[in-house]
């Protein structure tokens, strides 16, 4: 079955967003609805909350009726079949998956089963319904310890240091193999760096189920009084202040990158040339018929240290935050930030928000919702 064209107007297109109730997914759904797309969320709520869906509708105003929500796992073939049978899906933005690095080392079977086997169920059903347009939520973890800074899309992939990262590498390779076997596949791999921040309204944001694994939500929970002290893992790295440096990107900037990627897939921006992954090249650049595998880093292109983040958050919340220096964690690297030239040139996308704004928006979300989506 031939692939769907993405050449039409946004309001004539329906995007399936797996994991759309999650942190990045919810912000992406808001941006899609703002751009007048029809959106179907498929989410089993294992890492999220239905309240997020209600708030997406709230933020979408007059376009709220263009959103549908289906509570189901990507492993549920019958549910996936119903989604495609009952909705004229044009493209998929695939966020769904378990995502805790530490947990993945303790539960590798569950991670490979859910993230890889579940994705294969989704891809198979999509192909059977003639949908071969996929934006995949990948990660900078696929680069491992980088050989150069800033990291470009041409940097080689390294063996992941944990099962979560390995699922990202595997799915990138699987989608690339699909295109090698069938040139109708239209795939964009978005490699995120470190998404933080929240919607400016303070109505949606990051809501970890347990003690946060990532720096910013941990800092925010210390600021709101839920946790006692920030742990800084290592202050002897070869960086300006000795703490690890990462590329933090506002989640709204990241969400807008997905909208730009849809335009790119439809031939509406960029040259349509696929990049990275060896000999893979875009097969077509005609309007609405671009195919191939394209890879883009989404970051700001600048690095901020752990102490930079803590001090920026102190300014946002107006209080000093306690922190203690702890030993380095195994596998952590000193510096990691992106080269984003290709996203600018091919997608017409540039991150707009700085670290101060990320912290301000995160604090607004956390202070307005100290218990996340729990009332």
Question: What spans do the regions from the language model cover?
Answer:
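Generic structural "secondary-structure junction" signal
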Residues: 55, 76, 144-145, 153, ...
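Pocket-edge positions in alpha/beta enzyme catalytic cores
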Residues: 72, 84, 111, 159, ...
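C-terminal substrate-binding subdomain of Rossmann-fold SDR/epimerase-dehydratase oxidoreductases
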Residues: 215-375
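Short, flexible, glycine-rich and Lys/Arg-enriched loop motifs at helix boundaries
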Residues: 50, 54, 193-214, 225-246
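Short capping/connector residues at structural and topological boundaries
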Residues: 106, 147-148, 156, 169, ...
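Short-chain dehydrogenase/reductase
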Residues: 112, 161-169, 205-213, 217, ...
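N-terminal Rossmann-like NAD(P)+-binding domain of SDR-like oxidoreductases, especially those catalyzing
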Residues: 1-198
């Amino acid at each position: 079955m031939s692939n769907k064209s993405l050449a039409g107007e946004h309001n004539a297109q329906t995007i399936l967003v797996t994991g759309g109730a999650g942190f990045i997914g919810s912000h992406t759904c808001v941006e899609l609805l703002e751009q007048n797309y029809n959106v179907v969320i498929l989410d089993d709520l294992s890492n999220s909350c239905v309240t997020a869906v209600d708030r997406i509708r709230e933020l979408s105003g007059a376009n709220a009726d263009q959103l549908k929500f289906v509570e189901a796992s990507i492993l549920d073939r019958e549910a996936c079949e119903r989604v495609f049978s009952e909705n004229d899906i044009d493209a998929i933005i695939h966020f769904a998956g378990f995502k805790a690095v530490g947990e993945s080392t303790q539960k590798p079977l569950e991670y490979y089963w859910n993230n890889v086997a579940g994705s294969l169920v989704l891809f198979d059903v999509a192909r059977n319904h003639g949908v071969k347009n996929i934006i995949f939520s990948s990660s900078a973890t696929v680069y491992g310890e980088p050989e150069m800074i800033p990291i470009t899309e041409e940097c080689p992939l390294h063996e992941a240091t944990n099962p979560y990262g390995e699922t990202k590498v595997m799915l990138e390779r699987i989608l690339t193999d699909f295109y090698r076997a069938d040139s109708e596949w239209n795939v964009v791999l978005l490699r995120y760096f470190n998404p933080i921040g929240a919607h400016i309204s303070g109505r949606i944001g990051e809501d970890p189920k347990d003690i946060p694994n990532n720096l910013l939500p941990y800092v925010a929970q210390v600021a709101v009084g839920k946790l006692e002290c920030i742990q800084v893992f290592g202050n002897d790295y070869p960086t300006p202040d000795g703490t690890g440096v990462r590329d933090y990107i506002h989640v709204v900037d990241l969400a807008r990158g997905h909208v730009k990627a849809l335009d790119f897939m439809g031939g509406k921006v960029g040259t349509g040339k696929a990049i990275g992954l060896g000999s893979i090249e875009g097969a077509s650049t005609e309007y609405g018929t671009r195919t191939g595998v394209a890879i883009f880093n989404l970051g700001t292109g600048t690095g901020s240290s752990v102490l930079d983040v803590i001090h920026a958050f102190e300014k946002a919340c107006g209080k000093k935050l306690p922190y203690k220096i702890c030993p380095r964690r195994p596998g952590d690297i000193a510096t990691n930030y992106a080269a984003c030239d290709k996203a600018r040139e091919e997608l017409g996308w540039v991150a707009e928000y700085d670290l101060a704004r990320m912290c301000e928006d995160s604090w607004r979300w956390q202070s307005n919702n100290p218990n996340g989506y729990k009332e």
